[in-house]
Amino acid sequence: MIRILDTDFNLQAEIEPIYMEWTRRYYRGDSFTFKVPLNTYITSLNYVIFDNRVGVITKIVSYKDYLQVSGKEYGFSVNKRIVSPSTQTGAAETLQKYYVTANCITPTARKILNLSVESDQGRGTSTTLPARYQDLEELLVEIYQRTGLGWCIEYLSGMFIFTTIEGKDRTSTQNINPRAIFAEEYGNLEEVVVTDSINSYFNVVYMGGQGTGAGRTVEEVGTGTQNNRYELFADAKNLSTTTQIQDKGNEILNEYRETYQLAGTFRSTDSITYETDFFLGDIVTVKHDDYMLDLRLVEVKQIIDTKVTYEFTFGKEPNTINNALNKRLSLINSEVRI
């Protein structure tokens, strides 16, 4: 059952979809799609409430017998925010909440209605993050890639709360938390698909430092040679020392490593249940063929059809065309003169 609200948050209808997918991600906003009867009254920008998640309808397609509705999570996934220039140093959680507050809450004209930020607990490793006109959601993805800290927006009593997620280590080799182990032979993982990709792999980056034209400082970071060399350019005008440029270059190359992912359909068993024994963002152990892999659960797609199923993605952020483009744009962003 989903609830439909108008743009003033008034309840319009409660609907049982013919079919629905709701995808939660550890590193960026949710997305959803569902089908309803053709005579259902529904419009773009209506809000959709499912469990404690709220989405905004951004697209409606009419077919012969039904409407297909899709959208994204309420907040800056829909109402995009571009980050004002700033360089901050601190714990990953502190940086997340600073940039959300500075670009979505404090400025009156840019405020996203009813959005608040939970109290800062200072979780995650410390890092220095220069920001300059990036998409806010992509900046939060960068924080995740550097520190492993995720986020979500929860709906509680009419308020949307930006919340930090810190996944737990539930791998087979640790003894602190209950373990979560997945394998086809255990009956809790089916239809496994493994992806090993170098589509977005680079091992050398040219860091454009201060100066202009022929006088601009350019530092080369990385050691690839000949046919094992994959080059990239990134802007670093806001960095002043060679050490800072080298460190930033290494961070960028870390984001463009070979991508390994494993996806499959989860089946609950007597010994393991989603959101009871493990959660989105946890690092778990996946057994596949002769390998035992420790991977983070980064994406959960809940499918409601004749039954409820879950499709899991373990590993890094998926390398979609949009994600790759957003990464490239963020690297050259400060080249644009405004």
Language model features: what each stretch is:
Residues 1-27, 183-195:
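Solvent-exposed edge beta-strands and adjacent loop segments
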Residues 8, 15, 34, 71, ...:
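Amphipathic, non-transmembrane alpha-helical segments in extracytoplasmic/periplasmic proteins
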Residues 24-37, 65-77, 207, 256-270, ...:
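Oligomerization/assembly interface segments of phage tail-like spikes and tubes
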Residues 35-41, 273-277:
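Short, surface-exposed secondary-structure edge patches
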Residues 37-118:
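Surface-exposed cap/loop segments at beta↔alpha junctions
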Residues 54-61, 293-302:
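Short beta-strand-centered aromatic/proline hotspots
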Residues 61-78, 113-202:
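Short beta-strand-centered interaction patches in the first periplasmic/extracellular domains
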Residues 141, 170-258, 262-296, 305-308, ...:
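Acidic, small/polar-enriched beta strand-loop surface segments
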